[in-house]
Amino acid sequence: MKSQWHGTCDLRLFKSSRSNNKDVVKTIHQAKCTAPLKVMRVFNDKKDGRCEIPILHSAGGIVGGDQLTINVNAEEDSIAICSSVAAQKVYGSRGRSKLNPQGSWANQKCFFQIKKNSDFEWIPQELIVYQGGLFEQNMTVNLDLSSSFLCVDLVRLGRTAAEEQLGNGVWRSSLEIFRDNNQGKHYEFSDRLELSGEALKSIHGLEQKPVFGSLTWITPKKIKQKDLSDLLVECREQRAGLEGFMTCSLLENGISARYTGSSTQSARFWFYRIWSLTRILRKLSMPEYMRIWPMQENPSRDKKCPS
C-alpha cells in the first residue's frame, strides 16, 4: 500500500492596486496548495509592504517516496519572503531491504520565476535529516536583471542530541539560477552538493560536523562591484563571537556564504546579519524576525550586528 505524499504549493505574488497608505504599495498573494503543504496566515503589514508567507508541512515530516513541488511566480515590483512554519524532519528511508538496499528518496522541487524589479527571499527553517534519510532538493530560479533573490539552506545531519549521525543517509542539493539578456537565457549561478559517506568525515567536507548551511544572494545588476567588495568585508566581520567555520566569497553578481559546525543558532545568526547587510546596501527596511521563527533568539543583540 503506497503512502507517499505528492504535495504542491503554487504562489503568485503581485503588488496591490489598493492600499490605505499611499506611500506604501503592498504585495499580495494568491495560493493553491495540495496536502501536505499549506499556506498559513499571510502578513503584509511591513513598512515596505513586503509579503510574509509561512508554508506549513502538515504531515509533520518527510519520508522516502514523498514528493513536494513549490512554484512561485513573483510579478513585477513584488517583494516577499517565504519560510517554513517549523523545522522540517526527513525520516529514515522507507523500503530499505536486501532487494532494495538503496531505499526510497524524498524529493523537493522549487521553481521560482522572479520578474522585473522584484525582491524575493526564500528562508526556510532548519531541515533535520534523520539517520538513513534520503533527501534531494532541486531549485530552479529565473531571475530578471533588475531583480534580487536571496536563499538560505540550513541542514542538520542526524539528531545530534540523541548522539545520532546520518549513517547511510544522503542530503543532496541543486541550485540553478538563470538570467535573461540580449543573447537569451544564461547561467547566473549553479551549485550542486551531496553530503554523505566520506564527505561527512573528510577535512575537505564536514569533518564530522553535523550542521551545514549556505546563503546565496544574487543582486540586481545595478549593484556596483565596489559595493559588493565592501559588503564581503562586512560579512566576514559579522562572524565574530559565533561558533563554527564560516566562509564568504564574491560571485559575479552577488555573494555566497557557507557554514559548517555544530550550532544551527550560530549559522542562523550569521546568515541573519548578512541578510541585514544586503538590505542596508539597497537602502531597504531592516529585516524582522518572522512571527513563526524562534522568538527567544535575537541576533541583533550582538554589538557587531547592524541595527
From Swiss-Prot:
Kindly indicate whether the keyword Transit peptide belongs to this entry: no
The reply to whether Chaperone figures as a keyword in the UniProt entry is yes
Give the keywords, sorted: Chaperone, Cytoplasm, Nickel insertion
Single GO cellular component term: cytoplasm
Check the record and name the Pfam families matching this protein: UreD
Q: Where is this protein primarily located? A: cytoplasm
Q: Where in the cell is it found?
A: Cytoplasm
GO molecular function (one)? nickel cation binding
Oligomer and partners: UreD, UreF and UreG form a complex that acts as a GTP-hydrolysis-dependent molecular chaperone, activating the urease apoprotein by helping to assemble the nickel containing metallocenter of UreC. The UreE protein probably delivers the nickel.
Q: Would you identify the family this protein belongs to, as annotated?
A: Belongs to the UreD family.
Q: What does this protein do?
A: Required for maturation of urease via the functional incorporation of the urease nickel metallocenter.
Question: What is the name of the protein in this document?
Answer: Urease accessory protein UreD
Q: Which organism is it from?
A: Prochlorococcus marinus (strain NATL1A)
